[in-house]
């Protein structure tokens, strides 16, 4: 897989969107993003209905090369498939390879299973944020509203509303949360995942700041 050196098959570095969704409890937060890479290697992204965020890869990344490698791998795969299809006795796969349709948690849920997919470009990404990396912090620049809270022993699983979107976080300690309270949020650590929306593959991991 393209980018496999940066995205190992572990909890925090899955190879693609499907694996990221499958691994972990509570489930990962998927956030659609749109943006470009700057000269310093970072990406300025528009997320969560219009907010601006800065993603910095943990390792050096040249996105244009990554996209070129992705396209070359896809072309080779298509050529190999065409060659196999020409062989006698070839049976086409019933489960054709398709990009995993991830779920975006929203306050007002919609059934988009039959919706037509928008045109995806190289400026379209998906961020993967594990709940343990969403923190309530006084210095946080992201504002959210407590939408739900479930104490589970030494930690609490919280649902936070940001605009029309819902994010899941895991907060350690015995704090009590009041529904509707506004809280400052930050995304911690350097294991925030950046996925290619076109292929579903993990590009790299890094930090995310608002």
Regions found by a protein language model. Name each.
Residues 1-7:
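Short, small-residue-biased leader/transition segments that mark boundaries at the very start
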Residues 3, 12-13, 24:
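Phosphate-coordinating loops and pocket residues in cytosolic domains that bind phosphorylated ligands
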Residues 1, 22, 151:
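Short glycine/serine/threonine-biased micro-segments
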Residues 25-27, 34:
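Elongated periplasmic alpha-helical coiled-coil
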């Amino acid at each position: 897989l393209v980018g496999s050196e940066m995205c190992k098959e572990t909890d925090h570095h899955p190879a693609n969107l499907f694996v990221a969704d499958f691994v972990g409890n509570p489930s990962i937060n998927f956030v659609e993003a749109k943006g470009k890479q700057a000269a310093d290697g970072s990406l300025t992204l528009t997320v969560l209905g219009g907010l601006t965020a800065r993603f910095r890869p943990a390792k050096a990344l040249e996105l244009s090369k990554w996209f070129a490698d992705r396209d070359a791998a896809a072309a080779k795969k298509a050529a190999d498939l065409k060659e196999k299809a020409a062989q006698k006795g070839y049976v086409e796969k019933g489960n054709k390879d398709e990009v995993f349709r991830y779920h975006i948690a929203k306050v007002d849920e919609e059934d988009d299973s039959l919706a037509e997919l928008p045109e995806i470009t190289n400026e379209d990404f998906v961020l993967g944020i594990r709940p343990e990396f969403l923190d309530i912090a006084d210095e946080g620049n992201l504002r959210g509203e407590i939408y739900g809270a479930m104490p589970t022993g030494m930690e609490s699983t919280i649902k936070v509303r940001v605009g029309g979107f819902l994010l899941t976080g895991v907060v350690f300690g015995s704090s009590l949360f009041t529904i509707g309270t506004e809280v400052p949020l930050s995304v911690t650590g350097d294991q925030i995942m950046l996925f290619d929306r076109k292929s579903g593959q993990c590009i790299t991991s890094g930090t995310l700041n608002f």
